[in-house]
Each structure stands twice: as C-alpha cells, then as structure tokens.
Amino acid sequence: MSRIGKQPIPVPAGVDITIDGQNVLVKGPKGTLDLTVAEPIMLARNDEGAIVVTRPDNERRNRSLHGLSRTLVSNLVTGVTQGYTVSMEIFGVGYRAQLKGSNLEFALGYSHPVVIEAPEGITFAVQSPTKFTITGIDKQKVGQISANIRRLRRPDPYKGKGVRYEGEQIRRKVGKTGK
C-alpha cells in the first residue's frame, strides 16, 4: 500500500468538496479548483468526513497513480485554504522587474523588455526591483509560471547573474586562470 496514498485527506472547515465519479470539485475561501482523477483510482468520504483515495489492485500503474492522486487532491484543498506563493529574486547589474498593470515586465540584458502576462488565478507582486512573488491557488500553475520566469535568464554558474528562487543555492564554477 502506498504510504502517501493510504493517508486520508482532512477537510478543513469552510471547504466544500464534491466528488462525482472521477471528478473532484473543491470550493474554499480563496476560490474553486477541480480535478479529474485517473480512471482506476476511486475517491470516497470516510466516517470523519475526510477524503480517502483507494485503488482496485496492486498493478504497477495503479500503485503509481494512488499516491499521485492523493497528493493532487490534497494540493487542491491546501490551495483553496492557504494558497501558494513562490518568491524569486534577480541578480545582475541592470536586471530588474516591474509591474505593468497585472503583467510583469523584466529587463534582463536583452535588447527588449520581456513581458510575462498573468494567467487567470495568478497574481504578481514586486517588493523591490530585484525581488518579486508569484501567488495563486493552483500549485501547478504557480510552479509552472515561476519555472518559465526562471528560464528567461537562468542563473549563470560563473557570476551568479540571473533569475532564481529565493534561497536557491547556485553551484559556482571557477573561471579560467590567466597565464
């Protein structure tokens, strides 16, 4: 049995979960999220009102989907109650970010500014020209947007310039030695 998959998902007060076959709809104070769980995985409520994820057999694919499905549903519950935030920072001379309406505009050493449009459910906040946060209720969207932004200018291993997650340690390389 999957150690993660067999744990029930507690449902906090103020969260309404609707299970309709393979579809899960989670409503909470921050918004609404839905998910379609893979076919063999089954969802149900136990006596305490928590969500229980089960699988029909121990086939390899079903074992893999068991823990994944439980984690995805748990992420929905956390998203509609607390939300997700990713903090990022920019290193490099002249590199900066600024908010233009709901979009984020970057100066990253290219000949043009790079504009990232905020998808539905995602908000950007700029604390300083070199620090900003990405906030939303969908963990996958927040993570994907932050990865896309980091990809605009990956941290350089020689000088450390670029966009990185807050607290991320960049493995530095030693440059060439002179003659």
Curated annotation (Swiss-Prot):
Disulfide bonds: none annotated. GO terms for biological process: cytoplasmic translation. The keyword Protein transport does not apply. PANTHER family: 60S/50S RIBOSOMAL PROTEIN L6/L9, LARGE RIBOSOMAL SUBUNIT PROTEIN UL6M. Part of the 50S ribosomal subunit. Gene3D superfamilies: Ribosomal protein L6, alpha-beta domain. It holds the Pfam family Ribosomal_L6. GO terms for molecular function: rRNA binding; structural constituent of ribosome. Signal peptide: none annotated. Keywords: Ribonucleoprotein, Ribosomal protein, RNA-binding, rRNA-binding. Belongs to the universal ribosomal protein uL6 family. The keyword rRNA-binding applies. It comes from Mycobacterium leprae (strain TN). One of its GO terms (cellular component) is cytosolic large ribosomal subunit. InterPro entries: Ribosomal_uL6-like (IPR000702), Ribosomal_uL6-like_a/b-dom_sf (IPR036789), Ribosomal_uL6_a/b-dom (IPR020040), Ribosomal_uL6_bac-type (IPR019906), Ribosomal_uL6_CS (IPR002358). HAMAP family: Ribosomal_uL6_B. This protein binds to the 23S rRNA, and is important in its secondary structure. It is located near the subunit interface in the base of the L7/L12 stalk, and near the tRNA binding site of the peptidyltransferase center. This is Large ribosomal subunit protein uL6.
